[in-house]
């Protein structure tokens, strides 16, 4: 993941692999261009430098996504795509904000109290689960079921460690999820420094009267996320569900929208998505009940074999649902030259992609030429093509794409939410 020269961008390779079939000859012989190098100061509107990071110049691309080099305390990290960059910079911002809590004496005292809490409770839970549960849980219901499952798993060795079980029983695990969502980050983030800081910060809730609200009240302005009303249900799902429950609910939703069991299992087992991101894919698909053959979208998402490809597919699902609900209703999904393409109910094809900066490279030319021919080969070809992307296109790319008869819509924003 580190070092531009030694890491070949995977997205371009993935599209090329899917589109080596039926590539028109003119796409292989025409003139191409090299994606332009860009100044991060211009791209990021002066935000190329900030506390804890520096986006290095120049920014390169592969014809689909921009490729960034970001300097942090951990070294230089290669980040592929505008979405991934926005995600990482926000994670760094939250990490620094949480770290600033150490300047508050009462918070530091809370951390010390949490660190001194005895571990006998956990040990007795594992060695005598029934006896301890009688002393710590009253009544029945979902929480009791969680505790029983967690203790049984710990005793059998099939679950998490005693420390993880303790976090669940004491409420620290839920506090961590609530804290993460309140500051606009994924509780299951892959960014290890932030994950460790969330653990440390949430641990204070086991000491005294500390709550997540008390913690967030100490954070600098602009960090707390005010979720839109329509996002409340998803927020509650992430906060209130244990990892096991979230996985079960996500899989159930995928099943309900027609995703085959093989694809369901493959997506749920894909290590390049977080648990929250898998849930986001499932619930975005559920929000498109009138669209046929959505399983093709899930199949492509399940095939992601790298983090950048996974985040690209996640953003594409979000963008497609947004298009369906705000631009034009979609009718069904067709596999065109190996890529799922949406057909609108009015007969127009919607090629909806979270591309950053489209340049007319050989791979881009092959990709779009094959898609153009594939659309024309459908039993009922579309009456037009709406090519909608989140970024922009070079002059050459715009000219060549327009020659296909496609209508180009650029700089279409990803809606505000947990996906950047």
Task: Annotate each predicted stretch with a short phrase.
Residues 1-8:
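N-terminal secretory signal peptides that target proteins for export/translocation
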Residues 107-126, 195-216:
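Membrane-penetrating hydrophobic segments
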Residues 13-23:
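Bacterial N-terminal signal peptides
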Residues 141-159, 228-267:
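Membrane-engaging insertion elements
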Residues 34-157:
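Cationic, glycine-rich low-complexity segments
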Residues 317-379, 385-389:
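Conserved catalytic cores of phosphodiester-cleaving nucleases, focusing on short active-site segments
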Residues 257-339:
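Acidic-basic catalytic patches of nuclease active cores, encompassing PD-(D/E)XK
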Residues 390-420:
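Domain-level recognition of nuclease-like catalytic cores that cleave nucleotide substrates
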């Amino acid at each position: 993941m580190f070092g531009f020269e030694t890491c070949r961008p995977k997205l371009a390779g993935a599209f090329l692999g899917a589109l080596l079939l039926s590539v028109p000859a003119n796409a292989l012989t025409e003139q191409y261009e090299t994606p332009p190098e860009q100044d991060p100061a211009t791209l990021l509107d002066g935000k190329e430098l900030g506390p804890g990071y520096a986006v290095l110049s120049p920014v390169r691309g592969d014809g689909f996504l921009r490729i960034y080099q970001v300097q942090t305390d951990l070294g230089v990290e290669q980040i592929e795509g505008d979405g991934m960059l926005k995600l990482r910079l926000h994670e760094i911002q939250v990490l620094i904000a949480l770290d600033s809590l150490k300047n508050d004496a009462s918070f530091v005292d809370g951390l010390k109290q949490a660190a001194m809490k005895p571990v006998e409770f956990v040990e007795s839970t594992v060695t005598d689960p029934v006896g301890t549960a009688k002393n710590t849980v009253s009544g029945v219901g979902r929480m009791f079921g969680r505790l029983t499952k967690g203790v049984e798993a710990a005793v059998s060795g099939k679950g998490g460690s005693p420390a993880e079980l303790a976090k669940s029983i004491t409420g620290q695990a839920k506090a961590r999820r609530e804290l993460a969502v309140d500051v606009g980050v994924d509780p299951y983030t892959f960014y290890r420094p932030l994950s460790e800081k969330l653990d440390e910060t949430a641990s204070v809730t086991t000491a005294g009267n500390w709550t997540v609200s008390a913690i967030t009240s100490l954070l600098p302005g602009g960090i707390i996320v005010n979720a839109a009303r329509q996002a409340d249900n998803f927020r509650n799902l992430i906060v209130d569900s244990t990892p096991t429950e979230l996985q079960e609910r996500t899989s159930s939703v995928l099943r309900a929208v027609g995703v085959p069991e093989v694809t369901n299992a493959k997506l749920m087992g894909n290590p390049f998505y977080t648990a929250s991101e898998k849930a986001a894919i499932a619930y975005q698909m559920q929000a498109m009940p009138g669209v046929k053959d959505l399983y093709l979208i899930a199949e492509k998402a399940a095939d992601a074999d790298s983090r950048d490809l996974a985040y690209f597919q996640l953003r594409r699902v979000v963008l497609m649902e947004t298009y369906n609900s705000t631009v034009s209703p979609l009718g069904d999904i067709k596999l065109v030259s190996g890529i799922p393409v949406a057909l609108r109910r009015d007969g127009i094809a919607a090629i909806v992609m979270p591309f950053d900066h489209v340049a007319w490279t050989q791979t881009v030319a092959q990709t779009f030429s094959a898609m153009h021919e594939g659309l024309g080969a459908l039993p009922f070809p579309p009456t037009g093509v709406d090519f909608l992307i989140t970024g922009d296109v070079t002059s050459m790319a715009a000219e060549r794409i327009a020659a296909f008869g496609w209508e180009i819509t650029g700089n279409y924003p990803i809606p505000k939410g947990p996906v950047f």
